[in-house]
């Protein structure tokens, strides 16, 4: 859903893509925080994927922040270690696919989190399209 207008994103907008070699450094990965709930063997990584300016311009986006909460049983990996592994798998999927768009990034995250140590992935996205 477009967070500015409240309208649903159409299938055409969600599947709109650009070749990955046309946009240098298309994604910015940021770990927001790491939670270690007390008395559990889980670790929660809050990860944000941001589309860079050139990718947003190519896809007619005003803002695109994809927020993920990854619940894992991997308590050995620090935040930066997990983020590097996560980023590598997402970019590997996208480079093999050859195109990058909103739905393709979400599919790449599903590929990166399809591991035995990942319990749950929660998504909360902030996407705004250009009016003009």
Curated annotation (Swiss-Prot):
Keywords: Host-virus interaction
Record field: transmembrane: none
Biological process annotations from GO: viral process
InterPro entries on file: Gemini_AL3
Record text on subunit structure and interactions: Homooligomer. Interacts with the replication-associated protein (REP). Interacts with host proliferating cell nuclear antigen (PCNA). Interacts with host retinoblastoma-related protein 1 (RBR1), and may thereby deregulate the host cell cycle. Oligomerization and interaction with PCNA are necessary for optimal replication enhancement.
Biological role stated in the UniProt entry: Increases viral DNA accumulation. Enhances infectivity and symptom expression.
Family: Belongs to the geminiviridae replication enhancer protein family.
Entry protein name: Replication enhancer protein
């Amino acid at each position: 859903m477009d967070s500015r207008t409240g309208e649903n994103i159409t299938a055409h907008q969600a599947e709109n893509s650009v070749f990955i070699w046309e946009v240098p450094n298309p994604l910015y990965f940021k770990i927001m925080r790491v939670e270690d709930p007390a008395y559990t063997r889980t670790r929660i990584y809050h990860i944000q994927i941001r589309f860079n300016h050139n990718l947003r311009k190519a896809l007619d986006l005003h803002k695109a922040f994809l927020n993920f909460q990854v619940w894992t049983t991997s308590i050995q990996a620090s935040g930066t270690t997990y983020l590097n592994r996560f980023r590598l798998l997402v970019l590997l999927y996208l480079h093999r696919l050859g195109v990058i768009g909103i739905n393709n990034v979400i599919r790449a995250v599903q590929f990166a989190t399809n591991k035995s140590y990942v319990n749950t992935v929660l998504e909360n996205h902030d996407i705004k399209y250009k009016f003009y």
